[in-house]
Amino acid sequence: GWMHDLERMTITDLRQWHDRWYSPGNATLVIVGDVEPDNVKTLVKRHFGNIPARPVPEARLPLELNEPGERRSTQYLKTRLPMLMLGFNVPALNTSDNVTEIHALRLISALLGGGESARLPARLERQQELVAGASSWFNPFARGDSLFMLSATPNIQKGITLDQVEQALWQQLQALQETPPDAAELERVRAQLIASEVYARDSITRQARSIGMLETVGLSWRLLDSDFDSLNAVTPADIQAAARRFFTPQRSTTMHVLPEEARP
């Protein structure tokens, strides 16, 4: 949130918010592990059964305009280095009419920024020496619409500017629009993404969080069982189609982040 919103809030505002939303009807209790169901039910009733139920307001999905038009901003923040952030309005699993596109965006994020062998670090950082670091991220499990984000820090030792970094990021996106990844690159990225999910499921805590997160945003925990099949179904053509649909100026927000000392 924004600091000016927090500064305007009162204790009464916070209590009303808490009373409105923090109730059993708006909670998800997840228990994972080697437990006896009957014993768990007894413990749940003992520790949570006395909490009174309250009506819960209908929660609306936070939807965004598909193509709000190109937006640009410059922010002067407490940071040592400049940064370029480029975001695109995209749907999530909750709001998409084509879930294959969402899984394609997941793989695009991994293809661009998923590790040292990904395109942004390999091409922009090591080959072209334009950036000191670059990353991408996308949350497919948002309660409403989501953002596909790219960020990069220019190589100031080489005198690279934010405008040059911005142009380089767009070139990487346009490369996906013009030419789909070859099968070998897609399989490598897919294997890395699935492997990271498999390792994460070794953690009981991570399992509980994943189940709770899906149910809380309105998706089924059973998506975990079909997730790998969904990723495996994505083709190079799906990657190209998603890049063409979503990575457009009309969906984009560009932010130049500069140190406060650079303010004119």
Predicted regions and their residues:
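Low-complexity, intrinsically disordered Gly/Pro/Thr-rich segments
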Residues: 237-244
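M16 family metallopeptidases and their MPP-like homologs
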Residues: 1-4, 26-32, 82-95, 122-233, ...
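Short, solvent-exposed loop/turn segments at the edges of secondary structure
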Residues: 22-25, 67-70, 78-83, 102-103, ...
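An aromatic/glycine/proline-enriched structural segment found at the starts
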Residues: 28-94, 201, 256-264
